[in-house]
């Protein structure tokens, strides 16, 4: 069931943000295998460009639908890939995503 859930999330994100997504990464306690039934599902969406308000609304709709369908809290953050590449070696959060992240989808 979890793979189906992740596939559905990836599909929803890609539909909400066409041509912007570079990769989608699961990180945090679920990726580390230290999650509990109450843990949120941390997702980083790496983008080629910033989101406008309409894109933010579409992504929010996907996340809310997933939260309700699976009775989980999906914590989805967007990261502009150029900013990530510039700061990944010095920002602890980015280093954690690199170290523990599981890539759910990547652009070809």
Model-derived segments and their meaning:
Residues 1-22, 32-37, 48-108:
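Catalytic core of pol beta-like nucleotidyltransferases
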Residues 42-46:
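Short beta-strand->loop micro-motif that forms the acidic, two-metal-ion catalytic signature
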Residues 29:
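Conserved H-loop
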């Amino acid at each position: 069931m979890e793979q189906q859930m992740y596939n559905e999330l990836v599909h929803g994100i890609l539909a909400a943000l066409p041509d912007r997504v570079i990769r989608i990464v699961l990180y945090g306690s679920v990726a580390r295998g230290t999650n509990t039934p109450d843990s949120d599902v941390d997702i980083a969406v790496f983008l080629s460009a910033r989101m406008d308000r309409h894109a933010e609304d579409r992504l929010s709709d996907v996340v809310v639908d997933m939260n309700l369908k699976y009775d989980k809290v999906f914590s989805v953050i967007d990261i502009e890939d150029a900013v990530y590449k510039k700061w990944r070696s010095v920002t602890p959060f980015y280093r954690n995503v690199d170290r523990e992240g599981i890539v759910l989808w990547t652009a070809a």
